[in-house]
Protein backbone atom coordinates (compact mmCIF):
# COMPACT_ATOMS: atom_id res chain seq x y z
CA UNK A 1 0.00 0.00 0.00
CA UNK A 2 1.62 3.24 -1.08
CA UNK A 3 0.16 6.63 -0.49
CA UNK A 4 -0.47 8.29 -3.78
CA UNK A 5 -0.93 11.66 -5.32
CA UNK A 6 -4.10 11.12 -7.32
CA UNK A 7 -6.10 13.61 -9.28
CA UNK A 8 -9.38 12.16 -10.42
CA UNK A 9 -10.19 13.09 -14.01
CA UNK A 10 -13.40 15.01 -14.62
CA UNK A 11 -13.78 14.46 -18.33
CA UNK A 12 -17.04 13.16 -19.77
CA UNK A 13 -17.30 9.37 -19.76
CA UNK A 14 -20.18 6.93 -20.10
CA UNK A 15 -21.45 4.62 -17.42
CA UNK A 16 -22.84 1.16 -18.13
CA UNK A 17 -26.30 2.59 -18.82
CA UNK A 18 -24.82 4.80 -21.54
CA UNK A 19 -25.37 7.97 -19.53
CA UNK A 20 -22.67 10.62 -19.83
CA UNK A 21 -21.09 11.25 -16.45
CA UNK A 22 -18.07 13.05 -15.10
CA UNK A 23 -16.00 10.97 -12.77
CA UNK A 24 -14.70 13.46 -10.21
CA UNK A 25 -17.66 15.81 -9.90
CA UNK A 26 -20.67 13.61 -10.67
CA UNK A 27 -19.72 10.14 -9.53
CA UNK A 28 -17.23 10.62 -6.75
CA UNK A 29 -17.97 14.10 -5.45
CA UNK A 30 -16.49 14.32 -1.97
CA UNK A 31 -17.06 10.68 -1.14
CA UNK A 32 -14.63 7.97 -0.23
CA UNK A 33 -13.88 6.00 -3.36
CA UNK A 34 -12.54 2.61 -4.36
CA UNK A 35 -11.47 2.46 -8.01
CA UNK A 36 -10.38 -0.56 -9.98
CA UNK A 37 -9.42 -1.00 -13.62
CA UNK A 38 -10.92 -3.67 -15.83
CA UNK A 39 -11.62 -4.68 -19.39
CA UNK A 40 -14.52 -6.90 -20.33
CA UNK A 41 -12.69 -9.32 -22.62
CA UNK A 42 -10.24 -10.08 -19.83
CA UNK A 43 -10.77 -13.64 -18.67
CA UNK A 44 -7.92 -13.92 -16.22
CA UNK A 45 -7.57 -11.27 -13.61
CA UNK A 46 -10.48 -8.83 -14.07
CA UNK A 47 -13.29 -11.19 -13.05
CA UNK A 48 -11.27 -12.01 -9.94
CA UNK A 49 -10.61 -8.37 -9.09
CA UNK A 50 -14.28 -7.57 -9.66
CA UNK A 51 -15.40 -10.46 -7.45
CA UNK A 52 -13.08 -9.19 -4.71
CA UNK A 53 -14.51 -5.68 -5.12
CA UNK A 54 -18.00 -7.18 -4.81
CA UNK A 55 -16.97 -8.88 -1.55
CA UNK A 56 -15.60 -5.60 -0.24
CA UNK A 57 -18.85 -3.91 -1.27
CA UNK A 58 -20.83 -6.49 0.74
CA UNK A 59 -18.63 -5.96 3.78
CA UNK A 60 -19.30 -2.25 3.53
CA UNK A 61 -23.03 -2.55 2.93
CA UNK A 62 -23.72 -0.60 6.12
CA UNK A 63 -21.90 2.45 4.72
CA UNK A 64 -24.18 4.97 3.07
CA UNK A 65 -23.85 5.55 -0.66
CA UNK A 66 -23.55 9.21 0.29
CA UNK A 67 -20.17 8.37 1.82
CA UNK A 68 -18.78 5.69 -0.45
CA UNK A 69 -18.49 5.14 -4.20
CA UNK A 70 -17.07 2.13 -6.01
CA UNK A 71 -15.96 2.70 -9.58
CA UNK A 72 -14.58 0.34 -12.21
CA UNK A 73 -12.79 2.04 -15.08
CA UNK A 74 -12.33 0.40 -18.46
CA UNK A 75 -8.78 0.21 -19.79
CA UNK A 76 -10.01 -1.06 -23.18
CA UNK A 77 -12.63 1.56 -24.08
CA UNK A 78 -12.77 0.69 -27.78
CA UNK A 79 -14.16 -2.75 -26.92
CA UNK A 80 -15.96 -1.91 -23.71
CA UNK A 81 -19.27 -0.45 -24.77
CA UNK A 82 -21.81 0.37 -22.06
CA UNK A 83 -23.69 -2.81 -23.07
CA UNK A 84 -20.59 -4.93 -22.53
CA UNK A 85 -19.98 -3.26 -19.18
CA UNK A 86 -23.55 -4.02 -18.14
CA UNK A 87 -23.07 -7.67 -19.05
CA UNK A 88 -19.71 -7.83 -17.26
CA UNK A 89 -21.17 -6.19 -14.14
CA UNK A 90 -24.15 -8.55 -14.13
CA UNK A 91 -21.91 -11.60 -14.37
CA UNK A 92 -19.86 -10.32 -11.46
CA UNK A 93 -22.97 -9.25 -9.51
CA UNK A 94 -21.34 -5.84 -9.34
CA UNK A 95 -23.69 -3.13 -8.26
CA UNK A 96 -21.64 0.01 -8.83
CA UNK A 97 -20.53 2.39 -11.58
CA UNK A 98 -18.52 1.13 -14.56
CA UNK A 99 -17.00 3.76 -16.84
CA UNK A 100 -15.90 3.78 -20.43
CA UNK A 101 -15.62 6.47 -23.09
CA UNK A 102 -13.67 7.73 -26.06
CA UNK A 103 -10.26 6.13 -26.17
CA UNK A 104 -8.34 9.40 -26.04
CA UNK A 105 -10.32 10.64 -23.06
CA UNK A 106 -10.00 7.33 -21.25
CA UNK A 107 -6.26 7.12 -21.96
CA UNK A 108 -5.75 10.60 -20.52
CA UNK A 109 -7.83 9.65 -17.50
CA UNK A 110 -5.81 6.47 -16.95
CA UNK A 111 -2.55 8.37 -17.29
CA UNK A 112 -3.83 10.87 -14.70
CA UNK A 113 -4.50 7.99 -12.30
CA UNK A 114 -1.22 6.25 -13.15
CA UNK A 115 -3.12 3.26 -14.45
CA UNK A 116 -2.35 3.46 -18.13
CA UNK A 117 -0.82 0.55 -19.96
CA UNK A 118 -0.39 0.34 -23.72
CA UNK A 119 -1.62 -3.24 -23.72
CA UNK A 120 -4.58 -4.02 -21.46
CA UNK A 121 -3.51 -7.67 -21.29
CA UNK A 122 -0.37 -6.60 -19.47
CA UNK A 123 -1.97 -4.44 -16.86
CA UNK A 124 -1.04 -5.34 -13.31
CA UNK A 125 -3.92 -5.33 -10.88
CA UNK A 126 -4.05 -2.07 -8.98
CA UNK A 127 -6.78 -0.30 -7.08
CA UNK A 128 -6.99 3.19 -5.68
CA UNK A 129 -8.69 3.84 -2.35
CA UNK A 130 -9.10 7.34 -1.05
CA UNK A 131 -11.14 10.16 0.34
CA UNK A 132 -11.93 12.64 -2.41
CA UNK A 133 -12.73 15.33 0.15
CA UNK A 134 -9.21 15.24 1.62
CA UNK A 135 -7.20 13.95 -1.33
CA UNK A 136 -5.84 11.20 0.90
CA UNK A 137 -5.32 8.30 -1.54
CA UNK A 138 -3.46 5.03 -1.53
CA UNK A 139 -2.62 2.66 -4.35
CA UNK A 140 -2.81 -1.04 -3.72
CA UNK A 141 -0.91 -3.28 -6.10
CA UNK A 142 -1.79 -6.92 -6.65
CA UNK A 143 -5.15 -8.57 -6.10
CA UNK A 144 -7.14 -6.54 -3.59
CA UNK A 145 -8.02 -8.26 -0.35
CA UNK A 146 -11.65 -7.41 0.51
CA UNK A 147 -10.85 -7.21 4.23
CA UNK A 148 -8.04 -4.77 3.52
CA UNK A 149 -10.32 -2.61 1.36
CA UNK A 150 -12.91 -2.62 4.13
CA UNK A 151 -10.34 -1.69 6.79
CA UNK A 152 -8.96 1.13 4.67
CA UNK A 153 -12.41 2.57 3.92
CA UNK A 154 -13.46 2.38 7.58
CA UNK A 155 -10.20 4.05 8.57
CA UNK A 156 -10.94 6.91 6.16
CA UNK A 157 -14.50 7.16 7.52
CA UNK A 158 -13.13 7.32 11.05
CA UNK A 159 -10.67 10.05 10.11
CA UNK A 160 -13.59 12.00 8.67
CA UNK A 161 -15.70 11.79 11.78
CA UNK A 162 -12.70 12.81 13.89
CA UNK A 163 -12.07 15.73 11.56
CA UNK A 164 -15.33 17.34 12.55
CA UNK A 165 -18.27 15.54 13.96
CA UNK A 166 -18.93 13.48 10.88
CA UNK A 167 -19.03 16.19 8.27
CA UNK A 168 -15.82 17.00 6.53
CA UNK A 169 -16.17 19.87 4.16
CA UNK A 170 -13.32 21.94 2.86
CA UNK A 171 -13.56 25.59 3.72
Per-region residue spans from a language model:
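Short acidic-hydrophobic, aromatic-tinged amphipathic segments that line or gate anion-handling sites
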Residues: 14, 97-101
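Extracytoplasmic
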Residues: 6-8, 28-32, 65-68, 80, ...
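Sec/Tat-exported extracytoplasmic proteins
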Residues: 38, 46, 57-64, 110-113, ...
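Structural micro-motif
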Residues: 9, 95-96, 107, 113-127
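Structural microenvironment flanking redox-active thiols in thiol-disulfide oxidoreductases
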Residues: 48-94, 103-112
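Thiol-/selenol-based redox modules, centered on thioredoxin-like
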Residues: 122-171
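Short active-site neighborhood of thiol/selenol oxidoreductases, capturing the structured segment around
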Residues: 23-53
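N-terminal "domain-start" segment that seeds a small globular fold
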Residues: 1-25, 51
